[in-house]
Amino acid sequence: CLLIIVPFLYTELSMSKKILGSIIVILIIAVGFYYQSQLSDDDGVKKVGFIYVGPVTDFGWTYEHDQGRKAVVEAFGDAVETTYVESVSEGPDAERAITQMARDHDLIFTTSFGYMNPTIKVAEKFKKVKFEHATGYQRADNVATYAARFYEGRHLIGLIAGGMTQSNTIGYIASFPIPEVIRGINAAYLAATSVNPTVEFKIVWVYTWFDPGKEADAAKALIDQGADIIMQHTGSAAAMTTAEE
């Protein structure tokens, strides 16, 4: 079992990093467009802020966003100044953090789906500040959204999983039942069944983006249910660590 789980999980991490790497490109382009649009207004340093749902050391979603922030600094040099706040929970804490940042920033990236409503609410109060919200669907005159085709990577992972599984059971650790996550599950499942029509997916919802304890417990539960391959749509490496045990 472990011989199958561990290599696959590292394969998933590697492929996910390639997909998440597109975030770096998105951030650079977004800042570039913003900077060019503001050149006629003044030539001062633009302050760009980032609100993160997890720690920058999670080696996942937040880590890649912070790599994007660093790439922005490298690309634009002294023309921009960046700041970030990490581990901001979705809800009232997010609104407070975004509001505080909006008081002295020109462009703000709110990097989690659950920041959508707080972003829209704060944007109404700070019309001169531009906002970029990750994976959301609400927009305003000063709020744009960005995303990548993450489901394409999960489709490839599903193909691999469908061909590798020996127990015919694949476990999936899911965060929240929102379109982004459900789309990923569907992509992986459709791909897996295209090469192995009898494969079964078992899903555990953890209702968090980053909680190593819950993710580890979910992985253990899926392994106990016969899964020999584990996928995840969460932010920590806890599932991989559990699979190695």
Language model segments and positions:
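Secretory targeting signatures
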Residues: C1-L39
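A residue-level marker of the well-folded mature domains of exported/periplasmic proteins
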Residues: L20, Y35-E245
